[in-house]
Design a protein with these regions (language model features):
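Conserved N-terminal subdomain of the carbohydrate kinase-like
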Residues: 48-142, 314-318
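Conserved phosphate-binding/catalytic region of the ribokinase-like
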Residues: 213-318
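Short beta-strand scaffold segments in enzyme catalytic cores
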Residues: 44, 90-94, 242-246
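Hydrophobic anchor at the start of a short beta-strand
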Residues: 2, 52-54, 78-79, 173, ...
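Conserved phosphate/ATP/ADP-binding segment of small-molecule kinases
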Residues: 156-249
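Gly/Ala-rich phosphate-binding loop of Rossmann-like dinucleotide-binding domains
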Residues: 47, 167, 281
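Short beta-strands and strand-loop turn motifs
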Residues: 115-117, 141-148, 176, 196-197
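Glycine-rich phosphate/adenosyl-contacting loop at the front of the ribokinase-like
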Residues: 1-56, 64-66
Length: 318
């Protein structure tokens, strides 16, 4: 069984507004309400690919209840840990029909979406212990996915704390997190880590250039550095330039680049993780897993929200 953990899930409210004007009354022309957060996204795409999984997440207020309802509708086994105070994050993703960043008072075509993200609730220590107790029941051979940011009140070592707590189990651990959260887990030897090339550059202070052979070689060099620090397999996503997988047997696979119109890259990296895990579940073949993962990430970028399983498999040709 695959279990995902999301500390700060969200309800993402996508709206489109014609000719957005700050300080004025604007009316939406389209709306979409989706659950969000790295682990939640991984669970959603796994379910759409037909892979049973369990989503564990902290839930507060009416927003948390709606997140649970939407995930249940996807066929996901939900395990919300209820927090009594506060409310789960409500995020607004604003796009103008003509684009998305301000230019002369309007949103220009070339810019990115405007996002306003909520804070989320504070998680008390007893709720962290409840999470630990849940994870201690995982069985040998299970997969545990840790991803995303954590609320500011939690210790920066929380991912490492979890891995130390479950160290007696033979789990397949996946970590998709930024700099310190990721680095702190490496000597626990996670099965897979998934930085993108920008996060890799932040860790090692270099300028990534995935478009050239020399640039990719440099990216692979730093992926090997993460492997030397303890990661078993390293998957580096590079946006429109595909992805690179470095396996625990020192094999390097380059993901195919799929063509399409990018609508929103939100959740693409999470989709890649889900597709990769689905591929491993189906064939236990790294190259196949990378292809399905790359297709899932691309299909997500070509969609408003996360892609459905049929679209992903058609793009992957599997």
């Amino acid at each position: 069984m695959i279990t995902t953990v999301t500390f700060n899930p969200s309800l993402d409210y996508y709206v489109t507004v014609d000719n957005f004007r700050p300080g004025a009354t604007n009316r939406t022309t389209s709306e979409l309400l989706l659950p969000g957060g790295k682990g939640v996204n991984v669970s959603t795409v796994l379910s759409r690919l037909g892979i049973p999984n369990r989503a564990v997440y902290f839930s507060a207020g009416f927003v948390g209840e709606e997140i649970t309802r939407l995930l249940s509708d996807e066929g996901i086994e939900t395990v919300p840990i209820r927090v009594e105070k506060g409310v789960s994050r409500l995020n607004m993703k604003l796009r103008s029909a003509s684009g998305s960043a301000l230019e002369n008072g309007f949103l220009s075509e070339a810019a990115e979406d405007t996002e306003i993200n909520g804070m989320g609730p504070d998680i008390p220590p007893e709720k962290i212990e409840e999470l630990m107790q849940l994870l201690s029941k995982l069985e040998d051979g299970d997969t545990l996915v840790l991803g995303g940011t954590i609320p500011g009140a939690l210790p920066a070592t929380i991912y490492r704390d979890i891995l130390e707590r479950v160290s007696g189990r033979k789990l397949r651990v996946v970590v998709d997190a930024t700099k310190s959260l990721l680095l702190d887990t490496l000597d626990c030897h996670p099965f897979l880590i998934k930085p993108n090339h920008h996060e890799l550059a932040e860790i090692f202070d270099f300028e990534p250039d995935p478009k050239t052979v020399e640039g990719r070689d440099e990216i692979i060099h730093y992926m090997m550095s993460l492997q030397n620090k303890g990661a078993q397999n390293v998957l580096c996503s590079m946006g429109a330039d595909g992805a690179i997988l470095l396996t625990d047997t020192w094999e390097v696979f380059i993901a195919p680049v799929f063509q399409g119109k990018v609508i929103s890259a939100v959740g693409s990296g999470d989709s890649m993780v889900a597709g990769f895990l689905a591929g491993l579940d189906e064939k236990k073949d790294m190259e196949y897993a990378l292809r399905l993962g790359s297709a899932a990430g691309s299909a997500g970028a070509f969609s408003r929200g996360l892609a459905d399983g049929e679209t992903i498999r058609k793009l992957a040709g599997v």
